[in-house]
Amino acid sequence: MTLRCAAIGAVVLAGLGCTAQAQDKPVNNGTDPTKLTTILQPTYEYLDLVGGFESGVLRLNYTQPFGEKSDYSLRLRVPVQMNDVLGNSGHDLGDASVMLTHVFGLTRTHGWVFQGEAVFDTAARPELGTGKNVLKGTLIYARFLPTGAIFAPAVVQSNSVSGQARRADVNTTTFDFYYVPKLADPRNLVTVDPAVNFDWENDKEFLSLAVTYGRVTGPALGGVGIVTVKPSLFAGGDRPADWGIEVGFKVLGF
């Protein structure tokens, strides 16, 4: 509980510290999946799990674009998390990952994004990871609507390729329907993210919905700071959780 409160407080205070420097000019707020930029982002997510359990994860993310057109990027993620399903509510290392992103076929009306991610079996305790090394592929089609909104449906496939023999294999598919409305104030952002999730290995399926609310706070660390809050809901008999909430602060373009 102490680490969870400290993490949430640090994330919120980091963003509030930049609010007084807010700017009126439009900035890249990180909602367009075809715009790759340098990102430093800590987030903390709490999930109310089914069965009366709970989990929390502090994710430390760093993204670096590269290539002549900055159409590639590499993201490193280290999670520090807890899950009390086995009675241990302490935080420890989860499964770290690295993700390569490539933007292609970009025009004024649409663009494509491919992401390849490797998730490594680095969790310090069994309940904090899958026990497997997992490869995840994501294909996104981003459509830029005449209203200025973005609709970017995606398909995500995850499969385990190695790991602990006693742990179940990973074979999941997610159909995601990401939408970004155009807001009058460019310093504000909203994303709506409904998804249909299939766990083929365990014969489970469930629905999820996450809505992100954000505010550009102004200059931070040589870039632009953004505070975000993301509540989420889950539905279906196989859902892993009932609801969740994530708070975050990210610096873009530093």
Label each region the model flagged.
Residues 1-31:
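Cleavable N-terminal export/targeting peptides
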Residues 22-254:
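Transmembrane beta-barrel domains of Gram-negative outer membranes and organellar outer membranes
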